[in-house]
A protein has these predicted regions:
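Terminal-region recognition feature
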Residues: 1-126
Length: 126
C-alpha cells in the first residue's frame, strides 16, 4: 500500500511541475517526434497562444528526430501563432529536431554548450 501512495505522490508532483512550466510558457519535446509527442506540443502551443497571444514561448527540445508529418505539424503551428518562439536545444536536435530548431526566428535559436545538431539529406522512399 505504501508503494501505491509513493507512486501517486510522485505522479501528482510530476503533474504539478508540468503545470508550473506551462504557466511559465515553457514547452518540452523529449524523445522521438511522433504523432503523440507532436499532438502534446501542438496543444500546448495553441493553448499558450490562446492564453496570451504575442507573449514569448520557450520550446526546449532534445530529440533524435522522427516522423516528418508529425514534425511538420509542430513546425506549421510554430509559424501559425503570433507568439514568438525561442527554441533551446538541451541535448540533441537531429533530423526533424533540426527542422524544429530552424522554425524559430533569427536570434531565437539557442543551444546548451554540449548540445548537438544533425542535419541530413531528406530521405525519400519509392
Amino acid at each position: 500500500m505504501a508503494d501505491k501512495d509513493k507512486s501517486k505522490d510522485k505522479e501528482e508532483k510530476s503533474i504539478k511541475i508540468q503545470e508550473t512550466f506551462l504557466k511559465e510558457r515553457k514547452v518540452f519535446l523529449w524523445g522521438e517526434v511522433s504523432d503523440k509527442s507532436a499532438r502534446d506540443v501542438t496543444e500546448k502551443l495553441l493553448y499558450l497562444e490562446m492564453d496570451a497571444p504575442g507573449k514569448e514561448i520557450t520550446f526546449y527540445i532534445n530529440t533524435p528526430g522522427g516522423s516528418i508529418t508529425a514534425g511538420m505539424a509542430v513546425y506549421d503551428t510554430m509559424k501559425l501563432i503570433s507568439s514568438p518562439i525561442k527554441v533551446v536545444v538541451t541535448g540533441m536536435a537531429a533530423s526533424m529536431g533540426s527542422i524544429l530548431l530552424c522554425g524559430a526566428d533569427k536570434g531565437k535559436r539557442f543551444l546548451y554548450p554540449h548540445s548537438r545538431v544533425l542535419i541530413h539529406q531528406p530521405l525519400i522512399s519509392g
